């Protein structure tokens, strides 16, 4: 991630990460202060998470994850990471049945708390009405979506790692998705690095199906949006 995220200039505290076993942990301290300080930090963190999902997927490493919020303790040199948000994120992540990520209730509650604070702001800044201006809900990197779990789909909030993340973070080192065959595109990533998917492996095939369905919907909608903004429609 280092050297790619220009949005880090907007955040007072950088996003950190460490890896243990097959787990990647992204974490970021929330700065104390008003929503005008906290909202950019959240946007940068979500950008980092979405970029990690996309970068790993492009390299044939489909990830799944969850974003939580709360008090935690971390000691990287000992691989120690504890706290309620760790448990919540692990529980939600482990039950998902796709390559993707969702926002946990604790994080969503925090977003809405900052949204309410943002709507109470008064005044103007360079002609912009400050009421709602710093709302963290004004972010293209999440979408309401039926999250696929092992038992069923549950309405929730998904992180967007389709081509919107490339434009959001001004990235040009990763090519946009150029195919409309999302099923084949996703399957190729799941089969990267010599992996094979057995015909009887219904569990993995369902993950591919769920991932392709999400990616297809998001990518198609985003392509139409870009065309409409450019006047091509």
Annotated model-derived regions:
Residues 58, 64-65, 69, 86-107:
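Catalytic/regulatory signature loops of cyclic-dinucleotide turnover enzymes
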Residues 1-4:
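Short catalytic helix/loop segments, enriched in acidic residues and glycine
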Residues 6-44, 53-84:
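Catalytic core of nucleotidyl cyclases, primarily class III adenylyl/guanylyl cyclases
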Residues 39, 77, 87-88, 107, ...:
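Alpha-helix boundary/interfacial micro-motifs
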Residues 9, 14, 53, 91-93, ...:
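Homeobox/homeodomain signature
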Residues 98-99, 103-233:
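Intrinsically disordered, glycine/charged-rich C-terminal tails and inter-domain linkers
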Residues 81, 85-94, 113, 120, ...:
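Conserved binding-pocket/active-site segment within a compact domain
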């Amino acid at each position: 991630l280092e050297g790619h995220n220009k949005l880090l200039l907007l955040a007072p505290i950088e996003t950190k990460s460490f890896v243990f076993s097959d787990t990647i942990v992204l974490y970021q301290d929330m700065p104390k202060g008003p929503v005008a300080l906290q909202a950019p930090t959240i946007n940068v963190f979500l950008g980092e998470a979405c970029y990690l999902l996309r970068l790993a997927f492009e390299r044939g490493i489909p990830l799944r994850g969850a974003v939580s919020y709360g008090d935690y303790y971390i000691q990287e040199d000992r691989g120690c990471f504890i706290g309620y948000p760790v448990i919540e994120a692990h529980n939600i992540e482990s039950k998902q049945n796709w390559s993707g990520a969702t926002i946990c209730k604790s994080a969503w509650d925090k977003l809405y708390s900052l949204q309410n604070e943002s709507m109470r702001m008064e005044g103007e800044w360079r002609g912009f009405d400050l009421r709602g201006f710093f709302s963290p809900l004004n972010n293209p990197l999440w979408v309401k979506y039926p999250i696929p779990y092992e038992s069923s789909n549950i309405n929730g909030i998904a992180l967007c790692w389709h081509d919107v993340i490339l434009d959001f973070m001004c990235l040009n080192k990763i090519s946009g998705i150029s195919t409309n065959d999302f099923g084949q595109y996703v399957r190729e990533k799941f089969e990267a690095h010599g992996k094979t998917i057995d015909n009887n492996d219904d569990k993995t095939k369902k993950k591919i199906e769920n991932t392709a369905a999400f990616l297809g919907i998001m990518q198609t909608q985003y392509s139409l949006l870009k065309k409409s903004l450019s006047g091509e429609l």
